[in-house]
Amino acid sequence: MATDETKRAAQEFLAAQFTEAVQIEEERLNAQAAFAFAPKVWKRVVETFMAQCEAWNAITKTESLTCKETILGDLRIRCAGKPDIITVHYDSRKLQVILRNTARPEHEGDSTFFIQGYNGGTEADLSRNNQRANLEVVVLGELRVLAGIGRTAK
């Protein structure tokens, strides 16, 4: 004979199983979305860098930043009069975007971002430390470091 406590425990068990199944399905959908939307995310990264460089140059009224895509598809950004360079590399197999900025202090390594799916597989975006990355802020910070004026305004 089942007591109320037994019924409650069995219901909790069923709820936990259902929640776990839903979580597994969402993770599967998000992984599929990451692969499906990765080229679009990379395109947005390229467009953001290009747009920020164009805006920077429009404000300075000179070609102080040059942003070019290499034959391999990487981005290279240079600042006039500076020896340093930003290289942005997209690894489609690992779903990674790697930013190398030679103007960064040595103790700061490359910035690695992952392309992850979100919202049950309906979208994908860059993330770092399992948090969505604000691409515009990241790009502006990297350009500021490249130009030698520091990551943030004083």
Where are these regions (language model features)?
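Alpha-helix boundary/N-cap detector
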Residues: 1, 5, 33-36, 40, ...
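Eukaryotic low-complexity, non-globular regulatory regions
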Residues: 1-25
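Contiguous, amphipathic alpha-helical segments that mediate oligomerization or scaffolding
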Residues: 18-66
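Generic signature of mature, soluble extracytoplasmic domains
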Residues: 61-78
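Intrinsic disorder/low-complexity polar-acidic segments
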Residues: 73-154
